[in-house]
From Swiss-Prot:
TPR repeats lie at residues 33-66, 70-103, 118-151. The keyword Plastid applies. GO terms for cellular component: chloroplast thylakoid membrane. The keyword Lipid biosynthesis does not apply. Keywords: Chloroplast, Membrane, Photosynthesis, Plastid, Repeat, Thylakoid, TPR repeat. This is Photosystem I assembly protein Ycf3. SMART domains: TPR. GO terms for biological process: photosynthesis. Pfam families: TPR_1, TPR_8. It is a peripheral membrane protein. Essential for the assembly of the photosystem I (PSI) complex. May act as a chaperone-like factor to guide the assembly of the PSI subunits. It is found in: Plastid, Chloroplast thylakoid membrane.
């Protein structure tokens, strides 16, 4: 059922995007950038990450709007994170945030990576490194929650359980 919904959403997005491209005033370059972005999203949703990255990189070459660039960079970060390249993923999330500081999903994903790295360090008995990563995770989750207080419930619970949420920090 979920796959059907995802496909319906993808098809709906594609139809709407085509309509918007025809009716909204946009330069040829903007339209081309958006087409690459759209193809990148389609490839990403079907799991073709190499194709998605190719399209996103082409979109980045053409897209000038910082807000739109932030979402392209965010999606590139998602792909690298899904492939386990957390260093590149973090780099692209930070680039996205440099252009658009109001991306709670990027903040959340950064926190998830730091939490994962903290867990791995803890398993290796590298407790100081683990604590540092958990502190970073807490910091990014707090920022994400401030932007989207009704989201990231698991993160809010983790912050409370671990004592990383002070009594004055209520969302």
């Amino acid at each position: 059922m979920s796959q059907k919904n995802d496909n319906f959403i993808d098809k709906t997005f594609t139809v709407l995007a085509d309509i918007l491209l025809k009716v909204l005033p946009a330069t040829k370059e903007e339209k081309k950038a958006f087409s690459y972005y759209r193809y990148g999203m389609s490839a990403q949703s079907s799991g073709d990450y190499a194709e998605a990255l190719e399209n996103y990189y082409e979109a980045l070459k053409l897209e000038e709007d910082p807000f739109d660039r932030s979402y392209i960079l965010y999606n590139i970060g998602l792909i690298y994170g899904n492939n386990g390249d957390y260093s590149k993923s973090l780099d692209y999330y930070h680039q996205a945030l440099d252009l658009n500081s109001r991306l709670p999903q990027a903040l959340n994903n950064i926190a998830v990576i730091y939490h994962y790295q903290g867990t791995k360090s803890s398993e290796k008995k590298e407790f100081e490194v683990a604590q540092n990563n958990f502190d970073k995770a807490a910091s990014y989750w707090k920022k994400a929650i401030r932007l989207a207080p009704n989201n990231y419930i698991e993160a809010q619970n983790w912050l409370k359980i671990t004592g990383k949420l002070s009594e004055t920090e209520i969302f």
